[in-house]
Amino acid sequence: QTFQIPVTSDPDAIIRDATIYLFAVNDGAVSELASLIQRPQALNIHCAGSQSTQLTAASGNRNAVIWPIYSITKTTQPLESIPLIVDGNSPEAIELAQQLALAVSDNVRTLNFEQRKYLHLNAVLVNNFANHLMAIAEQVSREHQIDFEILMPIINQTAQRIKDQSPQQLQTGPAKRNDTATMAAHLELLSAHPEWQEGYQSLSASI
């Protein structure tokens, strides 16, 4: 769906009499941009999941959040079913943000700031950290002439299985079995990368 709305990355080109401002920028730039607008009548919306609605308070006192639980890039566009998390500093701000979010996705949830902080933590765990572990596996594969593609079925299986069962119940592997011999062998294989050894040990202890 295409919205006929002005978009700019130039602060000097910001329309000064708009009724809604959506700050889809780096978290650290939101407050500064909001201070350039200072339009109390407008609804100011940012997309930073781990930040308070007050991040845009420099512009006015009607503030909200619409946060997509999805890694959006120029080449990866969001689907209509992706979760959009809504919050606001008043019932009116929440309602308006919900209306906008529902025009984009059919999966809109309202969470308060405390809940959003924990959800943001969870998103980092399942997305950023999981991706980093796969990046390590890819590098190990490359260093030892192994086709990383071999791991795709088990990667996909892991993502599919947790739709029906708790990840905690599905946990397997040497750490779960307390197979110290296998874990020691793995640590030896990672001897060239002490930081990976440390991560392996920490994760194994947590399991």
Q: Predicted segments — roles?
A:
Residues 22, 123-126, 130, 200, ...:
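Amphipathic, non-transmembrane alpha-helical scaffold segments
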Residues 62, 69-78, 89-90, 140-143, ...:
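Predominantly flavin-linked oxidoreductase catalytic cores and closely associated redox partners
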Residues 2-6, 78-163:
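Internal alpha-helical scaffold of NAD(P)-dependent oxidoreductase catalytic cores
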